[in-house]
Amino acid sequence: MEPSVLQINKKLETKKEVGLPKISIDEAKVSLTGIDGDFNRFRSTKKNNDSKMALLVLTSDIINELNDEGWPIKPGDLGENLTLTDIDYRSLAPNQKYAIGSTKIEISFICDPCSNLKALPYVGKEKVNDFIKTLLNRRGWYAKVLKAGRIGKGDIVKKI
């Protein structure tokens, strides 16, 4: 099977809420700053909308691993914008470029887990430290948008 987009996720800015879990959408307009309408407080306030952090990408194999370890994660829970399938998470690396829909992205760097994950109902304050340790090197990859366009659920992910 060819790698493809399993799910596209975004969350509108909501006062006093963190940017996760994100909600599934069928299609997204993607600009150089990320998915239109998606809000990431950390990226916008602490990182000055760093273009290398425009998208957060996660693969379904990591979600499956975490489910097998007892964490009931669903696509979008970790704040990722794109959940990809049929691609090995550990094969992703900085500077790799991909065409997805009419967009082009470049993998930037790994996303470190943070304490905002306590907002997930199955984590909470009690388990957040264990969850952060569990997610080290598995939270997802940030990506820069090289070419704006549209991405739809089911779009093929091609390495370029």
Regions found by a protein language model. Give the residues of each.
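Short alpha-helix capping/helix-loop boundary micro-motifs
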Residues: 83-86, 91, 139-149
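Conserved SET/PR domain catalytic loop and adjacent active-site segment
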Residues: 113-115, 148-153, 160
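Loop/turn positions that initiate beta-strands
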Residues: 95, 102, 148, 152-154
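Short, basic/aromatic beta-hairpin or loop at an interaction surface
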Residues: 71-81, 124-139
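Short beta-strand element of the conserved SAM-dependent methyltransferase core
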Residues: 82, 98, 143-145, 157-158
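Electropositive, beta-rich accessory/interaction domains or terminal extensions
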Residues: 1-100, 104, 109, 116
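Hydrophobic beta-strand signal
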Residues: 99, 106, 152, 158-159
